[in-house]
């Protein structure tokens, strides 16, 4: 770490020492890529507010690493995995999810998806074990006396560290497949009649047929699909803690869940007191563009520009597909800024420039930006919402298809299928989004909703973390459902008891009726005999 940031940490320690005790120590268990981009925004704000932030990351991390331009501390622990292992696994997951399993039948799709999830969580478990079983590391962290743990719920382990150190923890999360962790670890409510199951690509306005589809998805995820080897994780947690427990039981102790969406994006649904929505917390006003880029944008005149990015996880695409996309972009009057890392397409038009990196937020906030071509990642969508820019979605994997469905239902986007689209499909979608005023109007409506909040999303996220530190938790917000078994939660024991009572009453009444009938029959026979 540089001398500059060593001095910063010293000043932070001194300011905390002389303050009224408002500074806290935060331990972070992160997840890679866009998850880290979002979480890092929270951490930088915590540091700005004089909290000491330590990120626990492995030597195999590809995205979460020490930055000399940041006051965030990084505790790097060794692992037998390598950066190549992590990158190869991710590229395999992206390729299969984007181009293979999307064409599968229902059962085949979820069977392949489960295989991908199990491979992902194999690496997650390995990283967790390498951290938790590192006695030197655990001793060092325990002696630091952290006040709270901030963890991404997608990667289990943060809750285990919290149990080991006996400190409260807060989750940051977008979603998990089938809402597995949210339902089993958080007690979230998802009524299937109007809340679409994640990855079902449905809206909250479902027809009878769509409700059947949604129910099938729910039942499949609840009773068949396993996001990871549950028994293996439960056994690992029990061994580490020295008592019988489960992953979900440990997750239920979360003080707060910070969900990275908001009602400008979500369909309305019920949620618990210890859940808050902080979508778009990374968004901010646009800054000036680099000189060369600004000149290119200004050269577009009244036609404006289109911003095109498929995110940080897609580094290249096939030559055929790139040429098809470039051909469509060449036919619009707007200038195009395309985030692209690959061979220059032969059909690239004079109106299109390729960049390995784009200041996406600053471009979306530029007054000349007319549309955003996006893969549908949550971070990118929120930047478009923040600045009121209509979208053309090219979803690839994970929640991206659902994200674009949300924007389509709200009238701020159109979508095309990357596996089947032609130049004409992309061109028509772009023309519609740019030339039909309704898309811009709806995008601006979402933007106004996003900005009209009593507290900014970032301030709200930091508030809850500080709240948990101040009060040593937030137990008063956790519903009693967390302490109930599955049978108790669904009142199956009560229903069984009441059914038994009804059965007993029916049995007694039946016996009494039979007894009376026999008595009457005997009396009748006796009178007849007499």
Curated annotation (Swiss-Prot):
GO terms for molecular function: glucuronosyltransferase activity. Coiled coil: none annotated. It is a single-pass membrane protein. PANTHER family: EG:EG0003.4 PROTEIN-RELATED, UDP-GLUCURONOSYLTRANSFERASE 2B15. Belongs to the UDP-glycosyltransferase family. UDPGTs are of major importance in the conjugation and subsequent elimination of potentially toxic xenobiotics and endogenous compounds. This isozyme has glucuronidating capacity with androgens, such as testosterone, dihydrotestosterone (DHT) and 3-alpha-diol. It is also active on catecholoestrogens including 1,3,5,10-oestratriene-3,4-diol-17-one. This is UDP-glucuronosyltransferase 2B20.
């Amino acid at each position: 770490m540089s001398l500059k940031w060593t001095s910063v940490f010293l000043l932070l320690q001194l300011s905390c020492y002389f303050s009224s005790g408002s500074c806290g120590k935060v331990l972070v268990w992160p997840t890679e890529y866009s998850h880290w981009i979002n979480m890092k925004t929270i951490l930088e704000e915590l540091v700005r507010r004089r909290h000491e932030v330590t990120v626990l990351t492995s030597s195999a991390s590809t995205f979460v690493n020490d930055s000399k331009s940041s006051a965030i501390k990084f505790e790097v622990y060794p692992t037998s995995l390598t950066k190549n292992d992590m990158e190869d696994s991710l590229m395999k997951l992206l390729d299969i999810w984007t181009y293979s399993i999307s064409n599968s039948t229902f059962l085949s799709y979820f069977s392949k998806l489960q295989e991908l999830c199990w491979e992902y969580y194999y690496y997650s478990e390995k990283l967790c074990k390498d951290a938790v079983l590192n006695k030197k590391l655990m001793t060092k962290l325990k002696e630091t006396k952290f006040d709270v743990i901030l963890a991404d719920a997608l990667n289990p382990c943060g809750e285990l560290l919290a149990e080991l150190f006996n400190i409260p923890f807060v989750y940051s999360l977008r979603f998990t497949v089938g809402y597995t962790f949210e339902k089993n670890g958080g007690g979230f409510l998802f009524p299937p009649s109007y809340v679409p199951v994640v990855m079902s690509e449905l809206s909250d306005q479902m027809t009878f047929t769509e409700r059947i589809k949604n129910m099938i998805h729910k039942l499949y995820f609840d009773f068949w699909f396993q996001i990871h080897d549950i028994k293996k994780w439960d056994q690992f947690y029990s061994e580490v803690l020295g008592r019988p427990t489960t992953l979900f039981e440990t997750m239920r102790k979360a003080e707060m869940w910070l969900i990275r969406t908001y009602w400008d994006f979500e369909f309305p649904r019920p949620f618990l007191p210890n859940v808050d929505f902080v979508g778009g917390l990374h968004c901010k006003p646009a800054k000036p563009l680099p000189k060369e880029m600004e000149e290119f944008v200004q050269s577009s005149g009244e036609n404006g520009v289109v911003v095109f990015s498929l995110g940080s996880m897609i580094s290249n695409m096939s030559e055929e597909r790139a040429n098809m996309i470039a051909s469509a972009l060449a036919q619009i009057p707007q200038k195009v800024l395309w985030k692209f890392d690959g061979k220059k397409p032969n059909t690239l038009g004079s109106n299109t420039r390729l960049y390995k990196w784009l200041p996406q937020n600053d471009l979306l906030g530029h007054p000349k930006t007319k549309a955003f071509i996006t893969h549908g990642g949550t971070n990118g969508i929120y930047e478009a919402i923040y600045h009121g820019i209509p979208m053309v979605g090219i979803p690839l994997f994970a929640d991206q298809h659902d994200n674009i469905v949300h924007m389509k239902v709200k009238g701020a986007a159109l979508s095309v299928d990357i596996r089947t689209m032609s130049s004409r499909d992309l061109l028509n979608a772009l023309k519609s989004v740019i030339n039909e005023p309704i898309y811009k109007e709806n995008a601006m409506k979402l933007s106004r909703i996003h900005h009209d909040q009593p507290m900014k999303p970032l301030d709200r996220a930091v508030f809850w973390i500080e709240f948990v530190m101040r009060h040593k938790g937030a137990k008063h917000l956790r519903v009693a459902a967390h302490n109930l078994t599955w049978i108790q939660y669904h009142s199956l024991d009560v229903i069984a008891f009441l059914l038994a009572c009804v059965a007993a009453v029916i049995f007694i009444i039946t016996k009494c009726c039979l007894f009376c009938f026999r008595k009457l029959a005997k009396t009748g026979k006796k009178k007849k005999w007499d």
